[in-house]
Structures are given as structure tokens and as C-alpha cells.
């Protein structure tokens, strides 16, 4: 069984409040899905929720940064240890929800660490404000964090040969 395969499945009939799988439709709901193949398509038979991070949707900035984290994690997981990327993503999203740290500072930290882990940049002394463990990330001035994040996202797009949809 191949390990680097993406399978796409559609959830139908889950918008109804009484649907058994309506929780799987919520943004930032991480679920384990059991798929059933019907002809050339897959259907979701059951789902069990691993983690609900719906709190990311509490503000527009958190939602955008959370979406950026998801998209960059998905793109970088193809070339690195995907389990480590997933654990880092969950940690970052929880920090985004429960800490008072600026969302752009957390997004910058996450994207920067993905680039370092992928071997695309070397850490330097000038990066000391965001080259820290996610739990140690402190607030950076919002304008600075935003402009640095934008620069690192541009670099991310070049290094991973993708065009991000969320930022």
C-alpha cells in the first residue's frame, strides 16, 4: 500500500444539523475518515474527530493565519517528515487559539520553521525573535510580523513551487 498518496472524498448530506457527520464539515476539525470505494469514487463511511480547533475562527486574523498554516503544512509535508509537521501544526493552532500572542507572530514562527526544516534557509542571529520554539514565541510588533510573514511566504512559494491561495 503506497504511503504518499492523497485521496479526495466528498462529504454529502452533512449540512443537516441531525447528520451524524456534520462535525466533520466544521473548519479546523481534524478527523480520521473511513472511506468506502464506490466505482471510481470514494465516499466517507464514518469519521471520528481527533481534534477540534474551531476557536481559530474566532477572529478574521486568526482564521487567515490558521489557513496559511494549514496550507503551508500540507505543501511542506510532501518533502519532510509529515508526522512532525502535523504535530507542529496542531501545536501552532492551539497556541493561536489559547495564547495572547499576535497571530502574525505565530504565523511567522511557523512558516520560518518549515523553511528551516526543509533546508531552504539557514537560521541567523537576526532571526532570533522568531527562531524559537512555538511555546516561547513572543509578540512582535504587528507591522513587522506582517511584513516578515509576507516575505517568508513569498520565499516559501518559490522554494516549494506553489502559489498559496490563502494569503
Where do the model's predicted regions map?
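Non-catalytic alpha-helical scaffolds and adjoining flexible linkers that form interface surfaces
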Residues: 1-167
Amino acid at each position: 500500500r503506497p504511503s504518499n498518496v492523497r485521496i479526495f472524498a466528498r462529504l454529502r448530506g452533512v449540512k443537516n444539523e441531525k447528520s451524524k457527520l456534520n462535525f466533520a464539515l466544521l473548519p479546523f476539525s481534524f478527523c480520521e475518515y473511513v472511506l468506502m470505494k464506490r466505482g471510481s469514487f470514494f465516499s466517507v463511511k464514518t469519521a471520528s474527530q481527533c481534534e477540534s480547533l474551531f476557536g481559530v475562527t474566532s477572529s478574521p486574523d486568526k482564521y487567515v493565519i490558521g489557513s496559511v498554516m494549514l496550507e503551508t503544512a500540507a505543501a511542506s509535508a510532501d518533502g519532510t517528515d509529515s508526522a512532525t509537521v502535523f504535530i507542529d501544526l496542531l501545536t501552532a493552532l492551539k497556541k493561536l487559539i489559547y495564547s495572547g500572542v499576535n497571530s502574525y507572530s505565530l504565523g511567522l514562527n511557523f512558516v520560518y520553521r518549515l523553511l528551516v526544516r526543509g533546508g531552504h534557509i539557514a537560521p541567523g542571529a537576526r532571526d532570533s525573535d522568531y527562531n524559537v520554539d512555538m511555546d516561547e514565541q513572543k509578540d512582535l510588533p504587528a507591522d513587522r510580523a506582517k511584513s516578515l510573514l509576507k516575505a517568508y511566504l513569498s520565499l516559501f512559494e518559490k522554494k516549494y513551487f506553489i502559489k498559496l491561495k490563502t494569503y
